């Protein structure tokens, strides 16, 4: 959604195609490891309310998208180059994917619990590779440490805001 809105409002796709491919592969690595995670186990069959799940998923996606679009808008309005924005969006999307796993995997706030060793290793590896690619300009435009830190702070603030809203809603279901 963030890329679509970026194109509609700014007349360019705010992420390089190379970065899209890398993002997909890196995100799938965590998805494949999620079965090893240490989460809350129920001993009775789950009864999923698909309409409720869709609302929750849309709300989470909307939160990340609104904050991400605000971030991209700020960068565009304050003179960042399209290349820098592209890499910063890539970093933001990778971090949002890693953080959403942490947010939705537990009944606690994401900073109060930790994933399984394998999920944690894959997430840390994904984030480290993302930072290396962004800082070295491999397969995407190079960004500075300052731009990387700005993006990390935005993603972390977004995760905290989203989780502060998400957890009380989930506890009252």
Regions found by a protein language model. Name each.
Residues 1-112, 133-136:
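Membrane-embedded transport module
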């Amino acid at each position: 959604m963030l890329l679509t809105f970026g194109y509609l409002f700014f007349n360019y796709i705010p992420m390089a195609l190379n970065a899209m491919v890398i993002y997909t592969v890196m995100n799938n690595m965590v998805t494949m490891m999620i079965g090893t995670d240490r989460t809350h186990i129920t001993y009775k069959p789950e009864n999923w309310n698909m309409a409720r799940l869709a609302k929750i998923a849309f709300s989470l996606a909307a939160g990340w998208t609104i904050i991400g679009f605000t971030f991209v808008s700020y960068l565009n309005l304050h003179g960042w180059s399209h290349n820098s924005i592209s890499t910063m969006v890539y970093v933001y999307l990778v971090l949002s994917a890693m953080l959403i796993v942490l947010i939705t995997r537990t009944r606690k706030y994401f900073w109060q619990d930790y994933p399984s060793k394998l999920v944690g290793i894959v997430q840390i590896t994904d984030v480290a590779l993302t930072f290396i690619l962004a800082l070295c300009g491999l397969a995407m435009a190079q960004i500075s440490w300052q731009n990387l830190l700005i993006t990390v702070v935005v993603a972390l603030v977004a995760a905290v805001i989203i989780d502060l809203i998400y957890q009380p809603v989930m506890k009252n279901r």
